[in-house]
Amino acid sequence: MYESLLKHTAEYQKISASLATPGPAALFGLPPAGRALLYAALQKDLGRVLCIVTPGEAEATHFADDLKALGLTAAVFPPRDFMLRPVEGAGREYEYRRLSVLGALAGGRLNAICVPAEALLQYTVPRAEFQKNLSLIHI
């Protein structure tokens, strides 16, 4: 219901036209729920994967949850957890989550990825290299 109302506004048409070409875009002035609704409508219209940059991981998680509620498949790409000194035991949960999100993204299973700015600034493996090292298991 809200999406159909939104799609008939002049502002939506301008934003949709600007996103039809490659490159970044920024949106300011809407509350988070309004941005999520707008991004979900744009993704459904344009069929492109959204990369939404947020200030932190909490905001990325909330945004991904909002997008999931609007019918998109979304994931949070967490920042890498650095250990600056030796520790007895270190969990690898964040690395596993990062690899899982990269795999879903490379496999075309995501409509949107929510990325904290910290994670966006960290290096990751190039797509071709990542796909070369994947193993597909059929069950």
Language model features by range: what are they?
Residues 1-138:
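ASCE RecA-like P-loop NTPase motor cores
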